[in-house]
Amino acid sequence: MSDAGRKGFGEKASEALKPDSQKSYAEQGKEYITDKADKVAGKVQPEDNKGVFQGVHDSAEKGKDNAEGQGESLADQARDYMGAAKSKLNDAVEYVSGRVHGEEDPTKK
């Protein structure tokens, strides 16, 4: 599930699986526009308001953008992605642990 106003993971997956050669110009244009809109939404949405997977995706996108701009090595990119994923997974574990132990849902405070 994706955050409100963000491109869903199912939509991203189906777009990635279908080769561009099999897409109409309208489909390619729609993908381009929705990808750019999702990227902007990811940059303006605060990190603490993102779901786990949306946060990981945005961190990966940021790493990709940085790598393209600075020529980072693949190892550096992988390290960045792993750091972001670990951070978000840690947040998820803390959330689940708190809920199991009866703490109030922090997203509803």
Curated annotation (Swiss-Prot):
Annotated positions of the Phosphoserine modification: 21, 24, 59, 73, 97
Region called Disordered, residue ranges: 1-82
Keywords assigned: Phosphoprotein, Stress response
Family annotation (InterPro entries): HSP9_HSP12
Compositional bias per record (Basic and acidic residues), positions renumbered to this chain: 1-21, 28-50, 58-67
Record-level GO BP terms: cell adhesion; cellular response to heat; cellular response to osmotic stress; cellular response to oxidative stress; plasma membrane organization
The keyword Phosphoprotein belongs to this UniProt entry's keyword annotation: yes
S-S bonds: none
Presence of the UniProt keyword Cell cycle in the record: no
Listed GO MF terms: lipid binding; protein folding chaperone
Gene3D superfamilies according to UniProt: 6.10.280.100
Assigned GO CC terms: cytoplasm; cytosol; endosome; nucleus; plasma membrane
Induction statement: Strong, by heat shock, by entry in the stationary growth phase, and by cAMP, probably via the activity of a cAMP-dependent protein kinase. By glucose starvation and by fatty acids.
UniProt family annotation: To S.pombe hsp9 and C.albicans WH11.
Miscellaneous remark of the record: Present with 4490 molecules/cell in log phase SD medium.
Entry function: May play a role in a switch from carbohydrate utilizing metabolism to fatty acid utilizing metabolism.
The protein's name: 12 kDa heat shock protein
Organism per entry: Saccharomyces cerevisiae (strain ATCC 204508 / S288c) (Baker's yeast)
Underlying gene: HSP12
